[in-house]
Amino acid sequence: MSNETRAKIVKAAPNRWLVFCILTLSGGIAFKLSSMKDMFYVPMQQFMGLSNTQIGGALSAYGIVQTIGLIAGIYICDMFSKKYMIGGSLIGLGAVGVYLSTFPGYWGFLAAFGVMAILGEVTYWPVLLKAIRLLGDEKTQGRMFGFLEMGRGIVDVII
């Protein structure tokens, strides 16, 4: 993308700080579901009737799908509209959260973690980074990414 095109995009978004705040908030919330095991491992294990091996298998599936999918995610984020990709990913992650609240069995849990990897790591994360990159020009991109991580950290503390 040329510097002129990027400058037009930056100038065309007078509400870019509002967009930035919404993206930061969504970036802090989007990965909470996949990291629920950090705080609720034992209750999750008891209520869902899962063994350590089964939870480890689901987390391994998440990692494998994430690793392979990130390569595809680089290309996917350029093919479709960012607002539809981010919105669709967040809605999909919410639907997976609702499904997990029904305490599915192992195969449902495994599928949910695979879908979360696709929605969170393949279709959401690269698009979020590209959207943040497009909000700033060459001089402010580093600052925008710093503010993104700061905002995600604040959201993590609050939630």
Role assignments for model-derived ranges:
Residues G69-S81:
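Helix-to-loop junctions at the C-terminal end of transmembrane segments
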Residues G142-I159:
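Glycine-rich segments within core transmembrane alpha-helices of 12-TM secondary carriers
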